[in-house]
Structure formats: structure tokens, C-alpha cells
């Protein structure tokens, strides 16, 4: 199955809110059962294999839509604070915080040394991957927090995440 299937962006505020409501309701309902009383922990899962790898990370654009573009711009604003600082970091006199775009697949795949990137020439891609991975981590924290707040007693939460940088040879996996 190599066809790209539309999936929610992990940066989507709507997805985080709506799925958060579903997770909270699930937790409340499960906690009210005998099985729920026996639980000591819940694994929060999403993405490919339930391990927070981005949907379609093989040969497809990964999270390059409007939600991620907006998140990337907010992230850049927090990191650089001004167009001048962004231009200096990216070596691009036309770069602006308001118009920055997610690097396309070709730019993200091009590298001079395997998984290593040279910030002097590839800072735009470095920034995108850092934003992307922080977005995943923030989504994980969001859902773990909801589970803990929705459960009537202390509960362990966790997830499968945090593989080596070059897992699958695809930095964009998540």
C-alpha cells in the first residue's frame, strides 16, 4: 500500500483537542470497570506501529500541511524572534518568520553526510526536524497528561518513542 492516506497532523490543535476528549472519555469509562480497577498503567500510542512514527514516512511528504506549517512558524518565532536572526541562521536574505515553509521532501532527503547535517548550509532542514520531533514529544506529553488527569487514581503512562536518530535511515520517521 504505497498510496498516501490522509492522516491528522500531530501539530493540529483540533486533532489534539478532539482526540484528547476521546482519550479522556475512554479513560473515565474504562476506570469504571473491574478491568480498569486492575490497571497499573496505560501506553499512549499513535502513528505507525503505535510508536509515534509519522504516517506515510516512507516516500511521502510527512506533516507538511497547514497545521505543521503554522506550528513550524511558531517554533521559528520562539527560536529566532526576528526575521533578521532567521535570515542569518538560514543564510537566506528572503526568509521571514511569517512566510517560512516546511522544507520539501527533496530538501529533507538531501544531505552531505548521511544522518549528519551541516548547520551552515542545512539549518532550515535541521530546524524543521527539531520542530517536528518536539511536536511529537509534545503530543505524547499532552495525551499522557490527559490519561493521568482522567484516571481516578495514580497511573503509570508511557509510550514507545525515542529511537536512534537514523532509525530506518529516515530522519523524518518521527
Task: Kindly label every feature range from the protein language model.
Residues 1-174:
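Polysaccharide-binding and catalytic clefts of secreted carbohydrate-active enzymes
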Amino acid at each position: 500500500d504505497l498510496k498516501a492516506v490522509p492522516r491528522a497532523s500531530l501539530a493540529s490543535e483540533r486533532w489534539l483537542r478532539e482526540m484528547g476528549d476521546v482519550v479522556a472519555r475512554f479513560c473515565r469509562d474504562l476506570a469504571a470497570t473491574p478491568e480498569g480497577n486492575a490497571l497499573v498503567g496505560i501506553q499512549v500510542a499513535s502513528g505507525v506501529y503505535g510508536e509515534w512514527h509519522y504516517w506515510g514516512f516512507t516516500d511521502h511528504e510527512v506533516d507538511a500541511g497547514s497545521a505543521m506549517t503554522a506550528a513550524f512558524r511558531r517554533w521559528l518565532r520562539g527560536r529566532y524572534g526576528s526575521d533578521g536572526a532567521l535570515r542569518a541562521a538560514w543564510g537566506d536574505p528572503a526568509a521571514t518568520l511569517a512566510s517560512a515553509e516546511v522544507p520539501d521532501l527533496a530538501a529533507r532527503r538531501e544531505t552531505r553526510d548521511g544522518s549528519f547535517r551541516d548547520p551552515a548550509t542545512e539549518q532550515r532542514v535541521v530546524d524543521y526536524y527539531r520542530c517536528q520531533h518536539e511536536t511529537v514529544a509534545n503530543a505524547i506529553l499532552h495525551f499522557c497528561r490527559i490519561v493521568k488527569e482522567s484516571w481516578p487514581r495514580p497511573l503509570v503512562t508511557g509510550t514507545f518513542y525515542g529511537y536512534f536518530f537514523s532509525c530506518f535511515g529516515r530522519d523524518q520517521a518521527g
